[in-house]
Amino acid sequence: MLGNCIENVRKNVPLVHNITNYVTVNDVANVLLACGGSPIMSDEPEDVKEITSICGGLNINIGTLNKRSIEGMFAAGARANELGHATLLDPVGAGASTLRTNTAVELMEKIRFDVIRGNISEVKTLEQGSGTTKGVDADVADAVTEENLEEGIAFAKAFAKKAGCIVAITGAIDLVSDADRCYVIRNGRPEMGKITGTGCQLSGMMTAFLTANPEQKLEAAAAAVCTMGLAGEIGWSYMQKGDGNATYRNRIIDAIYNMDKETLDKGAKYEIR
């Protein structure tokens, strides 16, 4: 069951190196702490190799990339690969600009990732080399729905096979897939879209899950997605009149902090296709 994955995170307290964006860095750190991991943030090229060396996982997020941080991403990624660390790419906004798209594609080519996690438009951009990403949000025309679910599953499996890694496509319906099996996940609340950075937070947390569960990476990635979605549901249940998205953000982090094996196993909504 997926609950074992979060239990392993809490037992092992994996240290995760995050090269993440400046908009959400504090929340990424807090979510990593809440799930049982330990965060460290560094994107300075002269620093990242040593930082990655003392960690167990690497989370690369291109949300606020610049020339210096891009250099740091490649240096950290190469070192993580040398050490066999869990690695994740979050190609935020790929398809919205040439720099983002080219950087994400080159990272895929030069670094071995265990998971690529993004919205459907970002992942399609990596597949096609260009896309229709609207800022950092998925294009509505690309969204995975009940009507096109079979097509989405087939795309996820094909992309995972081509990329040689797990893909986690998040949205109203989440798909977490390798070349053979796809977790279709239906946890979450639409109101989570009113909080900036829930995807970035998930990427940090997912890296901790991968690091603590090296023998079951597909299940670990799915467990992280279910944890975030279920936390959104639990957090929303505590909202009161007058509460807004700032309160909701904190409720989600609190729900992750209090998540345990039993709660996750009971509340996770998924099927394997």
PLM region spans:
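Short, small-residue alpha-helix embedded
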Residues: K194-C226
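Charged C-terminal helix
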Residues: L230-R273
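Glycine/small-residue-rich loop that forms an oxyanion/phosphate-binding "nest" at active or ligand-binding sites
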Residues: S69-G118
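Short, well-structured alpha-helical segments that form the helix of a local strand-helix-strand
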Residues: F155-A156, A160, Q216-G232, I252-I253
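Conserved N-terminal subdomain of the carbohydrate kinase-like
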Residues: L2-L89
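Conserved phosphate/ATP/ADP-binding segment of small-molecule kinases
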Residues: T101-C182
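Short pre-catalytic strand/loop immediately N-terminal to key active-site residues, enriched for Gly-Thr
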Residues: I185-T196
